[in-house]
C-alpha cells in the first residue's frame, strides 16, 4: 500500500468478554468482499502484553493484566504508525497459558482497514489519536463474567476458581477505574454484545464512508 492510500483504523474497546472479538471478526468477514481479502486486518491488544519471559511463572501469575501498565502500548502505537506509512510489522504472539510472549510473531502487511480490539484501547490518548473511529461494547458485567468463565476454562486452561478470583481482585476493579471511564471517548456505544446487527451495519457503513473521504 502506498503512502497515498488511506489506512482507516477502528478501535473496539470494552470489558473482557463483552463481545469485542465477535463484532471485530464479523465486520472483518463481511467487509473482506468489499475492500479485498488482503486489505483488511484485525489486531488484538492482548498480543501487546509485555514480555515476561524473565519472570518466574509464580511472578507472572501475580501480574495485573487489567492495568494499562501490563501492556506495551508504545510498541502498538509504533506498529500502527508504521502500517499507516505503508510498512509491514511483526505482531507479537502472546500465550495465555505461559503468561508471556512466545518467540513467534505474525507478519502484518499494510491494510486499507485495521480493526483493533482490546479492553484498554481507549485509555491511551496516543492510541485514540491514531484511530479514525472508536467503539465501546457496553455489555452488562454479569454477562461478561459468565462468558469469561466459559471462555477461560474451555480455551485458556484456567480453573473456575482462578477466573473468579482474578475477576474479584483485578478485572472488576480495573474495569471501574479505567475501562468504564474510557467509554466517554467512544464515537459509537454498542449495547447487547457482539451480535447487535444494527450496530454492525452502522459500523460497516461508517467505515465505508471513511474509506471514501
From Swiss-Prot:
Q: Which SUPFAM superfamilies match?
A: P-loop containing nucleoside triphosphate hydrolases (SSF52540)
Q: Which stretch is the leader sequence?
A: none
| Record GO cellular component, one term | cytoplasm
Task: Report the catalytic activity.
Answer: uridine + ATP = UMP + ADP + H(+); cytidine + ATP = CMP + ADP + H(+)
Give GO BP annotations, semicolon-separated.
CTP salvage; UMP salvage
What the entry lists under InterPro entries is as follows: P-loop_NTPase (IPR027417), PRK/URK (IPR006083), Uridine_kinase (IPR026008), Uridine_kinase-like (IPR000764)
Give a GO molecular function annotation for the protein. uridine kinase activity
Cellular localisation: Cytoplasm
What keywords appear on the UniProt entry? ATP-binding, Cytoplasm, Kinase, Nucleotide-binding, Transferase
Q: Does the keyword Nucleotide-binding apply?
A: yes
Pathway annotation from the record? Pyrimidine metabolism; CTP biosynthesis via salvage pathway; CTP from cytidine: step 1/3; Pyrimidine metabolism; UMP biosynthesis via salvage pathway; UMP from uridine: step 1/1
Matching Pfam families, A to Z?
Answer: PRK
Record's keyword annotation contains Glycoprotein:
no
Give the matching HAMAP family.
Answer: Uridine_kinase
Query: What is the designated name of this protein?
Result: Uridine kinase
Q: Which species does the entry assign this protein to?
A: Vibrio cholerae serotype O1 (strain ATCC 39315 / El Tor Inaba N16961)
Instruction: Give the lineage.
Output: Bacteria, Pseudomonadati, Pseudomonadota, Gammaproteobacteria, Vibrionales
Name the gene for this chain.
udk
Amino acid at each position: 500500500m502506498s503512502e497515498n492510500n488511506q489506512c482507516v483504523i477502528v478501535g473496539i474497546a470494552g470489558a473482557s468478554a463483552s463481545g469485542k472479538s465477535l463484532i471485530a471478526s464479523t465486520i472483518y468477514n463481511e467487509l473482506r468482499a468489499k475492500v479485498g481479502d488482503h486489505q483488511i486486518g484485525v489486531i488484538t491488544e492482548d498480543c501487546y502484553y509485555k514480555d515476561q519471559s524473565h519472570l518466574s511463572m509464580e511472578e507472572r501469575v501475580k501480574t495485573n493484566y487489567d492495568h494499562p501498565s501490563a501492556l506495551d502500548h508504545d510498541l502498538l502505537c509504533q506498529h500502527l504508525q508504521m502500517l499507516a506509512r505503508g510498512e509491514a510489522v511483526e505482531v507479537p504472539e502472546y500465550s495465555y497459558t505461559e503468561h508471556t510472549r512466545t518467540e513467534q510473531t505474525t507478519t502484518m502487511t499494510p491494510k486499507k482497514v485495521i480493526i483493533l480490539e482490546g479492553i484498554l484501547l481507549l485509555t491511551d490518548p496516543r492510541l485514540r489519536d491514531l484511530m479514525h473511529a472508536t467503539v465501546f461494547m457496553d455489555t452488562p458485567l454479569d454477562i461478561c463474567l459468565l462468558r469469561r468463565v466459559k471462555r477461560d476454562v474451555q480455551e485458556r486452561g484456567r480453573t473456575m476458581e482462578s477466573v473468579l478470583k482474578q475477576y474479584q481482585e483485578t478485572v472488576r476493579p480495573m474495569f471501574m477505574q479505567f475501562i468504564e471511564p474510557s467509554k466517554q471517548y467512544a464515537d459509537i456505544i454498542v449495547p447487547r454484545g457482539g451480535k447487535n446487527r444494527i450496530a454492525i451495519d452502522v459500523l460497516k457503513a461508517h467505515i465505508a464512508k471513511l474509506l471514501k473521504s
